[in-house]
């Protein structure tokens, strides 16, 4: 039987939804990569009684490892370490070496500031150097150290900020205490296929057929997710079940090959960035208000290929900034393929790019008509060599959904245009 784990995400701000939980899903993925079965993810506030209740619940479920995130700071409501110590039956002790390391970090953070009482600050942070007796201390990334407390179950305590938690995780998995806790793990492989342009119902039908016809299908653990208008198919399996996965992949290619854009989990954003090497791109956006250009520039190194972007929400801006003829808008409407093409042409000329993408649409909630309801979005990808692709789609969802899905459609139109040479 595989080792089992549970996750406790702490923080009233997470529990109430003011802050989105990024740690639980991230830790879950890392556990699955290690071959550890995830039993539960729980979220609770900062009260020690609530944290301890979650720890006891997971222990009663028979998990081998509990991972907590949050509550390691110097303030009064940061009580996770003390709660874990009590749960594990360990005394809190002052680690003087850790206290000095934290003091050194604080001194570097303060720099030359003279308006802060360093001794008072150090005393306030002494709490972070109190660790459960017998625990393995994980070097702080910020000022908060993590700890691994061996036992049944073993408890790994990590800080809340993802920028601190993620590098600390890599250290934690190398500790003897954690490796011992997950020693019973089963080795798994995990593969991801990404699709675009296929309805979930089409994929569901194929998976039903695979379940009926593929020998060994029950050895594959498959999860599907619709994200940003794309379908993700994640398959986890033991190494000797790889032939079964290969048969499934062959079936997916045979039925939905045109929809598959990634068999290694790579994002369309990564693919577009690679395809733009040696080229430059410009964007012209209306209803998405710069979301496409933001997505393009999220990638490090995007300055090598992003020439410029224009957000032309008003019709007058389309005319003045991109040179879209006013009579074209009058004849066809701002949300039309001719206007999208003119916007792309204007962006191409204004920024001197090799390729341009334009988006114009009705995101809602108002503005729709019988002929052009809310969700109608027009796209154009134009190349400097004269090749052009235009599309009109009707996207479901609310305003936010339409805008986000529009950027995804644009990225895939761009990907296909660039792949065509």
Swiss-Prot record:
SMART domains the record matches: MoCF_biosynth (SM00852)
Disulfide bridge positions per record: none
Pfam families registered for this protein in UniProt: CinA, MoCF_biosynth
InterPro entries: CinA (IPR050101), CinA-like_C (IPR036653), CinA_C (IPR008136), Competence-induced_CinA (IPR008135), MoaB/Mog-like_dom_sf (IPR036425), MoaB/Mog_dom (IPR001453)
SUPFAM superfamilies on file: CinA-like (SSF142433), Molybdenum cofactor biosynthesis proteins (SSF53218)
CDD domains (alphabetical): cinA
Domain of life: Bacteria
PANTHER family from the UniProt entry: NICOTINAMIDE-NUCLEOTIDE AMIDOHYDROLASE PNCC, NMN AMIDOHYDROLASE-LIKE PROTEIN YFAY
Family that this chain belongs to: Belongs to the CinA family.
Protein name: CinA-like protein
